[in-house]
């Protein structure tokens, strides 16, 4: 079974995946609710950039946790339904299985990331018309894209956890919450902690995406983020290859 056929099968499975739809709907509602809150219920921050930072914090808090739930569900249902037995009997298809989960996960993640960016830009236009400009739009899109893509890479080890836990659910959920906590903790990095933050992949995401730091720290951060993604993928493939039917 090649990767293309596995991906085709994965897309067909999504039609009956309730958790996938729930995660998608909640993720789509959050940025809209933030806009409505600041426009109708309470006064928004004084500057558009402060508002964008709040949106980034709230959106990725929910998005990251739900992302963890989605990948957990994508893998766990294979164990619960017993369909993974067909994968485990074919040494060739095990790696394709891992890559197919990453591709489906990333496809879902990237589409929603673009959606969040669009809603945030429209919200800033709606709430802060005087500060809105194409330069502002560029800043928001670059920041959210960097933060989103880099944070996705740091969450790849979660796939390894979902494979290890098999039919269990909570271990990977707890790990997803922990990753999210560290990730968002990067929003409050002090100057004397920049070097340490660049060594920790999850805090390095904020360092690279939000803060204006010197290039050595950016290079260090990108290096460790890339390493954690590669390690997570390697461990996932190794774990699935070691499992018996």
Q: Whereabouts are the PLM-identified features?
A:
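Hydrophobic/aromatic residues in alpha-helical transmembrane segments
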Residues: 64-71, 84, 157-158, 201, ...
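Aromatic- and glycine-rich beta-strand/loop motifs that create alpha-glucan
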Residues: 1-24
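Secretory targeting signals
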Residues: 31-67, 99-165, 169, 206-217
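Hydrophobic core of alpha-helical transmembrane segments in multi-pass integral membrane proteins
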Residues: 26-35, 113-117, 121, 222-235
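Helix-loop-helix units of permease transmembrane domains in multi-pass membrane transporters
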Residues: 73-106
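Terminal transmembrane helical anchor/hairpin motif
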Residues: 37-50, 172-245
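Hydrophobic alpha-helical transmembrane segments of multi-pass membrane transport/permease proteins
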Residues: 18-40, 55-70, 171-186, 227-230
């Amino acid at each position: 079974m090649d990767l293309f056929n596995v991906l085709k099968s994965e897309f067909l499975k999504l039609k009956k995946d309730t958790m996938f739809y729930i995660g998608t709907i909640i993720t789509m509602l959050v940025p809209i609710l933030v806009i409505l809150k600041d426009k109708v219920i309470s006064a928004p921050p004084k500057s558009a950039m402060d508002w964008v930072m709040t949106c980034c914090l709230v959106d990725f808090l929910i998005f990251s946790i739900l992302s963890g739930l989605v990948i957990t569900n994508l893998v766990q249902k294979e164990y619960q339904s017993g369909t993974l037995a067909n994968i485990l009997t074919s040494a060739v298809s095990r790696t394709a299985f891992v890559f197919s989960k990453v591709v489906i996960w990333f496809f879902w993640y990237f589409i929603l990331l673009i959606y969040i960016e669009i809603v945030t830009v429209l919200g800033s236009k709606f709430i802060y018309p005087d500060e809105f400009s194409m330069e502002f739009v560029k800043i928001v899109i670059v920041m959210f894209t960097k933060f989103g893509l880099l944070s996705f890479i740091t969450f790849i080890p979660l796939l390894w956890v979902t494979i290890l836990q098999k039919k269990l659910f909570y271990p990977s959920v707890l790990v997803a919450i922990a990753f999210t906590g560290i990730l968002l903790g990067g929003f409050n990095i002090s100057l004397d902690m920049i070097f340490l933050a660049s060594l920790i992949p999850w805090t390095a995401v904020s360092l690279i995406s939000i803060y204006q730091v010197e290039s050595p720290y950016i290079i260090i951060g990108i290096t460790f983020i890339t390493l954690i993604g590669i390690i997570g993928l390697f461990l996932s493939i190794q774990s699935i290859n070691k499992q018996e039917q």
